Amino acid sequence: MTIVDAHHHPYRWVLFTGICGVYFAFGVVAMSIPPLVGEIRADLGLSRGSMGLALGAWQVVYIVSAPVGGRLIDRLGIHHGILLGAIVVTASGLVRAAATGFGSFWLAIALFGVGGPLVSAGAPKAVGLWFGAERERRLAIGIYSTMPAIGGMATLVFSNSVLMPLTGSWRATVVIETGVMVVAMGVWLVVSGRAPEPPMAVVPPRGSVAIGRKGLLASSEFRLVLLLGLGVMFIGHGLGGWMPEVLREHSGFSAMAAANWVALGGLVGVVASLVVPRRTERHRLPSAMAMILVAVAVGVAAVVVLPTVLDPISVAMAGLRSAMMPLVLVALMESDAVEPSNTGVAYGLWFAVAEIGGVTGPLVLGRVADTSAGFGGALLLVALVCVLMLVPVRRMRRFTDRDLRR
């Protein structure tokens, strides 16, 4: 096989379809709770703070399990690793539907954090192994990173408009949504089981040594990308977990209307995630990130200060936050210290640090919303975080501009 053939293996898009299916279902299960927050709080007797703690449960586990999951992906391979992750995510969805109180509800959501890292680290490793051409690789990153958002968007739309009226039960709704992962597992089992050997090398070239965890952490560029991941997750999980409730309680929308407007924001994020990474050259990554952060800050602040009738526009602007994830993932994959043989470890470390933001986002916003500041104060806090993230984004220029000068 020539180098060109290796970069364009005919099976790469078939395998990629299976990855996208699992990642889509990942988003469905992850987002199964936020549209139903009101019903679940009433049924289980949870305060906003307790619900925020539960929403961040799987991110707490991610902090510990992500490095382990990354190493498992490197050792088990993407076929078995992603399959194992999908099984655990399915179990999480079923167990959360059977919760009877805060403790069991928290544990059920936390279980998601055990299987999730295998999926989230397996997807970029597969892209690194099967997509050698830079533009195709960036396109693949943009596509698969939108799958959780699309899955979450579908959950937002169908939970209150179709499934809740059909079943009359938040528990049955969660079970049905978990069934999407069962279907995705079946597809992945078939397409990955028939896959040939990946065209890209999974071991370092002869005479070189794979960069391990210590080597990755010694890279200042890698550490900067870790910091960006923390901020992106704080914003993404914080707004993703609470935005439907913000529009219901702060702006006065119905549950269905709130879910639909949040889904619109998700659609904006999906389009941006597909377009921006592919068209953004490495030296322009900081500029693209800065523009998105400013837009998100303006959007969430506008929900607080502008008339409610303009909220859909503000929510759409805030939806651009989804495009930050693929941009940061591109920066991670193109870091000097990251290579195919250590992709799992690198992404495991990244998710471990990033999910600190994923944990604190829903928790902090929930706590702030429980105070006299309400959801307005919580949204202004998100805007402040966006502004603060402009500092590490600016520092990233020294790495992207360095590559431009080579």
Residue ranges and their predicted role:
Residues 102, 143-193:
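Helix-loop-helix hairpin linking two adjacent transmembrane segments in secondary transporters
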Residues 284-331:
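C-terminal transmembrane helical hairpin of 12-TM major facilitator-type secondary transporters
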Residues 33-34, 221-263, 270-273:
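Extracytoplasmic gate region of multi-pass secondary transporters
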Residues 31, 59-67, 153, 266-274, ...:
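Residue-level signature of mid-helix packing/kink "hotspots" within the transmembrane helices
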Residues 109-147:
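Cytoplasmic helix-loop-helix junction between adjacent transmembrane helices
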Residues 2-9, 195-225:
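Juxtamembrane intracellular "pre-TM" segments in multi-pass secondary transporters
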Residues 64-100:
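Conserved MFS/SLC helix-loop-helix module at the cytosolic interface between two early adjacent transmembrane helices
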Residues 340-372:
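A late C-terminal transmembrane helix in Major Facilitator Superfamily
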